[in-house]
Amino acid sequence: MAGKSTPMMEQYLALKAEASAGGDDCLLFYRMGDFFELFFEDAKVASGILDIALTARGKDSGEPVPMCGVPVHSAEGYLARLIKAGQRVAIAEQVETPEEAKARARREGKPVSKVLVKRDIVRFVTAGTLTEEALLEPRRANVLAAVCEVRGTLGIAHCDISTGRMELEECAPDAMDAALARLGASEVVAPENWDGAPADATLRPPSEFASDEGEARLKAIHDVATLDGFGDFSRAMLAAAGGLIGYLDHAGRGTLPFLLPPVVARGEAKLAMDAATRSSLEILVSQQDARSGSLIAAVDRCVTGAGARQLAEDLAAPLTEREPIERRLALVHFFHADPLLRADLREVMRAVPDLARALGRIVAGRGSPRDLGQIRDGLAEARRIRDYLASKPDRPALLDDLLPAMGGHGALVDHLQRALVPAPPTAREQGGYIAAGFDAALDELRDVSGNARRAIAALETRYRGETGIERLKIKHNGVLGYFIEVPAKHADALMAPDSGFTHRQTMAGAVRFNSLQLHEEASRISEAGGRALAAEEAHFEELVATVGDAREAIARTADALARIDVAAGLAERAAEGDWCKPAITDERVLDIVGGRHPVVEAALKQAGDRFVPNDCTLSGSDRLWLIGGPNMGGKSTFLRQNALIVLLAQAGSYVPASTATIGLVDRLFSRVGASDNLARGRSTFMVEMVETAAILAQASDRSFVILDEVGRGTSTYDGLALAWAVVEAVHETIQCRCLFATHYHELARLAETCDSLSLHHVRAREWKGDLVLLHELAEGPADRSYGLAVAKLAGVPAPVVKRARSVLEKLEKGREETGGLAAGLGELPLFAAALEERPEKIGDSMREKLAALDIDALSPREALDLLYALKTEASQTED
């Protein structure tokens, strides 16, 4: 920047340079009184995102300096929008008052009039470091992850600083994308010199990712001499932990958030799914990047935010071991079997505040009296819930394991109940949150203040009588304090030297005064109020410390409540949808009777329609189903619904089916649908091949694979050849359970050579080009794809469909005669000629159909289908 700057602007530029040191690209919120101001390019960026006015302040090099600002009291909402837009924000606060700045100037012998209040960056606000309630989604965890590679092993450390949970894990470098997709991290941190860093990672100095540094930091945080009591951590895990804690230290400017002792995340005990599978199955977000339309939206019946976050974690990382799955299922069954118990419990749970996040804010030094009140109320409700559930017979083992964590806080709850008012405020600056009777000295100070206020009210009455001014009032504001206000027309009476009043301020329609008595009472209020605020602040710090001492026990209580909420919510969902408890087995089977797609079924139900259930039975002797049939017939839905049923079962949930036996799956793969990844130069076909290659390389005989339309997007013969080879590889080499949907009828010949492959199709009917989709799965190969009928159903003009039918007939004739698809095309008339249609005699056609019918042989369903087809044909005739 050229040209002379004001001291304020020099301070701003110095802070901006500090905020941007190390390559950090962030906006600077610069505190000026009651506003956070932004200047230069920051102002342009923020004003565009926030849709606020862009103004100017002063000049730089002869040009106005762009500026915008947001009020401090509502800054959280603006911060949330900036973070959602992908920005990072440095907060520069005033770290001294104007009075302290003036006193400093006097000590330094500098002019008081030119002194500048000190400001410093107190915090960096980023997507992964949020703790404020207004900035977080109640039903979604906010995960920060750090990744690095140590001697060929990838270390991952991740935490949610709003709750303090921290886990360390390791995996092969090529599994990084799948691991990060499972975590759904809001922000990822990586060493800046690492070629393997994720493209969108926040890069940090490599020195922070040293295993020795990570070990030392963890020991210091938890005040232990060894980490052996927490788990067996590898060097890669500790290196990632060092990077994570180093970034948190940087973001908090030396103040670390609340972190629970780290635990080892056992990746091998979780159902492995890559990013493509998660996207395809729409587990936590839909293809439109929204919660609506996702699996969790269809399943979530939790009544607390903590429960919803736990459910999301369960769905993102289902289990692969039978015993813990069955423990979860037993807890769901306990609540499912007793509707009255479930209803009572859920009603009580609705009153449970978010203990984990309130605790996180308190321990991080950003807590409020309201957070303390939430700790008090949450622990009290936990005690009630524990006592209620403990009185029930036949409790499952998991519930008995959870109940002890929900008690033991009696002394803390009693202390908080005595100390706090029933509904503590969010802000503590005005006081009023310590309950009467908790501190006699504080009560006395409040009495002094209250007596002075009553004296001021009496003064107002007295002054009205003495002056005869009925509209005389004693008011208060933050600038003048207490003052006497009268209408301007009565001001002369109070201006007299012997009136006892002192002029303070003249307004447009009123004049303000002071008096000796008012000054004395105001001083008493101010002095007593200041001392009362100091006393409340001291009590607040003591309460925060007391809660902090119990933080690990409170966190365990929060986890137990969340787990119970998840189980009760899943039981509620099962009761709503007539879901069944799945049987879990170690055998390589998948036996689902009456299976439904949970998301599609919910959408159809909302529209007043019904989902058609289907069975799926895979075993060692019949482990690969080849499924044909028309588009829109339900093939993709059938594939996905079975994958989701497996996922739900291994997450510990009931499933949408009449009965279900689930053989444990170690890896779940879905290659259903694709979209062009133009940003990375990948076409639909390339994406399909990359995903298929990953499946062939990573699937085991215990995996479950769903594949849809492999080979589309290239020439017919290339696609058919690829699909053929993939089916053979899955059947002969991998030997896993697999559903394979295709339009290649030629693949049906594989049933002759693949002993464990069977043919299936989705049923459909066609009458004179009108397609009726039954959405039912049947055994045997599909006789045709009904592509032209689907095209007509989609609204393709009739002449085009007719032309396509002519081309199809010639193609099929050529293949029969010469084996070549293109043979016979030369006999086709020109396209324009083919479009010249003569009106079809629909009446004759309908008579022919009716004459050929064997009415006694029609089932009720077939008769109804025929009636609809004839009605459609008649409507087209009228058009």
Swiss-Prot record:
One of its GO terms (molecular function) is mismatched DNA binding. The keyword DNA repair applies. One of its GO terms (biological process) is mismatch repair. It holds the Pfam family MutS_I. Gene3D superfamilies: 1.10.1420.10, 6.10.140.430, DNA repair protein MutS, domain I, MutS, connector domain, P-loop containing nucleotide triphosphate hydrolases. GO terms for cellular component: cytosol. InterPro entries: DNA_mismatch_repair_MutS (IPR005748), DNA_mismatch_repair_MutS-lik_N (IPR007695), DNA_mismatch_repair_MutS/MSH (IPR017261), DNA_mismatch_repair_MutS_C (IPR000432), DNA_mismatch_repair_MutS_clamp (IPR007861), DNA_mismatch_repair_MutS_core (IPR007696), DNA_mismatch_repair_MutS_N (IPR016151), DNA_mismatch_repair_MutS_sf (IPR036187). Transmembrane segments: none annotated. ATP binds at residues 629-636. NCBIfam families: mutS1, PRK05399.1. This protein is involved in the repair of mismatches in DNA. It is possible that it carries out the mismatch recognition step. This protein has a weak ATPase activity. This is DNA mismatch repair protein MutS. It comes from Erythrobacter litoralis (strain HTCC2594). The lineage of its organism: Bacteria, Pseudomonadati, Pseudomonadota, Alphaproteobacteria, Sphingomonadales.
